[in-house]
């Protein structure tokens, strides 16, 4: 999966390509220079801007996108850097809503992958699986006890 560019970065690339096409013309007007300055400003503001925070529905959407079918936790599952001392537990909201977080931080809250179910062989199914009707008959016969079909009067 490729790196996702921010909107200002994409805008700069588009502006810069357009400007280079226009520079080939011998006349450079002040509007062209203004256009270039605007593009440079957009690029530098995107370079200095830090990661954004995710809260509420945006946080849930981001987790669903990153984790997919695995699902996710709002608190870190046990075993993620837990020490012997009980530290105050922080969750995804503390890490990504109150502070900014990156993709790796979001991935830490994904549920583990479930192992793929292995296909059982046909031979194993023949010997272990009985049709439902046979199971019911088998259960009826075993529930009579050791007396069989004999009726005892008392």
Swiss-Prot record:
Residues 126-139 have a biased composition (Basic and acidic residues). It holds the Pfam family Insulin. Residues 112-119 are annotated as: D. Residues 121-154 are annotated as: Disordered. SMART domains: IlGF. Residues 120-154 form a propeptide. Residues 50-78 are annotated as: B. Disulfide bonds join 55-97, 67-110, 96-101. Residues 140-154 have a biased composition (Polar residues). Belongs to the insulin family. The insulin-like growth factors, isolated from plasma, are structurally and functionally related to insulin but have a much higher growth-promoting activity. May be a physiological regulator of [1-14C]-2-deoxy-D-glucose (2DG) transport and glycogen synthesis in osteoblasts. Stimulates glucose transport in bone-derived osteoblastic (PyMS) cells and is effective at much lower concentrations than insulin, not only regarding glycogen and DNA synthesis but also with regard to enhancing glucose uptake. May play a role in synapse maturation. This is Insulin-like growth factor 1. It comes from Bos taurus (Bovine).
């Amino acid at each position: 999966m490729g790196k996702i560019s921010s909107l200002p970065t994409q805008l700069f690339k588009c502006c810069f390509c357009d400007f280079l096409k226009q520079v080939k013309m011998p006349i450079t007007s002040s509007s062209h220079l203004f256009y270039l300055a605007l593009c440079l400003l957009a690029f530098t503001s995107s370079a200095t801007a830090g990661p954004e925070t995710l809260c509420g529905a945006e946080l849930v959407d981001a987790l669903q996108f990153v984790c997919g079918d695995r699902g996710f936790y709002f608190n870190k599952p046990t075993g993620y850097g837990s020490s012997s001392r009980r530290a105050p537990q922080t969750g995804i909201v503390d890490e990504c809503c109150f502070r900014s977080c990156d993709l790796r931080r979001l991935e830490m809250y994904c549920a583990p992958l479930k192992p793929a179910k292995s296909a059982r062989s046909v031979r194993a199914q023949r010997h272990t699986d009985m049709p439902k009707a046979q199971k019911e008959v088998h259960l009826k016969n075993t529930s009579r006890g050791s007396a069989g079909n004999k009726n005892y009067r008392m």
